[in-house]
Amino acid sequence: YDIQPDMVTLAKGLGGGVPIGALLMTEEVALKMPKGGHGTTFGGNPLACAAALAVLEEIEGRNLLQHVSEVGNYFQEQLRSI
């Protein structure tokens, strides 16, 4: 569909069970955001950040995004054949 979001929110899966949330945005949106305008009292918790880093390293190290794409394509093909 060639859709490019301006913002994406992440949560549960990012921390592998440790509570965390994140907001990803384009540079254009980020430049319009006031400094500290999206912060929280709990933002930057070291344990949550370490957990998120470990999850991201696993995703990258195991090439999981490519695998998800391949499995998704296979799943769609199988559904179409029904």
Label the model's feature ranges:
Residues 1-82:
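Conserved N-terminal phosphate-binding loop of PLP-dependent enzymes in the Aspartate aminotransferase
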